[in-house]
A protein has these predicted regions:
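Short, glycine/charged-enriched secondary-structure capping and boundary segments
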Residues: 18-21, 120-124
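Conserved H-loop
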Residues: 126-129
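N-terminal helical cap/lid subdomain that shapes the substrate entry/recognition surface
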Residues: 2-8, 12-90, 101, 112
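Substrate-recognition element of Asp-dependent hydrolases with the DxDx(T/V) motif
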Residues: 23, 95-120
Length: 129
C-alpha cells in the first residue's frame, strides 16, 4: 500500500444534522419555501449531483432560483460546519495523524467546493492530509 484515500461522510464523521440545520437557515433566509429538511431527507439525496438535489428538494423553483438557493445553502453549510461540526467518529483525528506518518493521505468526495476543507478544519486534520 502506497497511500490511503478517505471519503468524508460516513467515514470520518456524520454531518447530516448540522447540514440540515445550515440548509434550513439558508432556505428561511433566501427563499419563501415552507419546508424543513432533516437527516432522513438529506440522506436520500447525499451522493447525488447538486442539479439532482435541487430538482428533488426544490421542484417548485425555476432553475435560476434553484441554483441561487443551492449556492446559498452550500456557502452557509461550509461556514456553519466550522462552528457546528458533525459528529466526529471516535479516534478519527488520532488515526489520521498516525497514518500520516507512514502514508500519504487523501480525501475524495463528490461534495461542493469548500466542504472537504470545512470537514478537515472541524476535525483538526488539515495538517495531515
Amino acid at each position: 500500500m502506497d497511500s490511503i484515500i478517505f471519503d468524508v461522510d460516513g467515514t470520518l464523521w456524520d454531518s447530516a444534522d448540522s447540514v440540515a440545520a445550515a440548509w434550513n437557515l439558508a432556505i428561511k433566509k433566501f427563499s419563501s419555501l415552507d419546508i424543513t429538511l432533516d437527516r432522513e431527507i438529506l440522506g436520500s439525496v447525499f451522493g447525488k449531483t447538486m442539479t439532482d438535489i435541487g430538482d428533488i428538494l426544490f421542484p417548485s423553483l425555476s432553475e435560476t432560483e434553484k441554483d441561487s438557493l443551492l449556492s446559498a445553502c452550500c456557502e452557509l453549510e461550509n461556514n456553519y460546519l466550522k462552528n457546528h461540526p458533525g459528529i466526529i467518529y471516535e479516534g478519527v483525528a488520532d488515526t489520521i495523524e498516525k497514518l500520516s506518518k507512514k502514508y500519504p493521505l487523501f480525501i475524495v468526495s463528490n461534495c461542493q467546493c469548500g466542504y472537504i476543507e470545512a470537514t478537515m478544519q472541524a476535525i483538526g486534520i488539515e495538517l495531515f492530509i
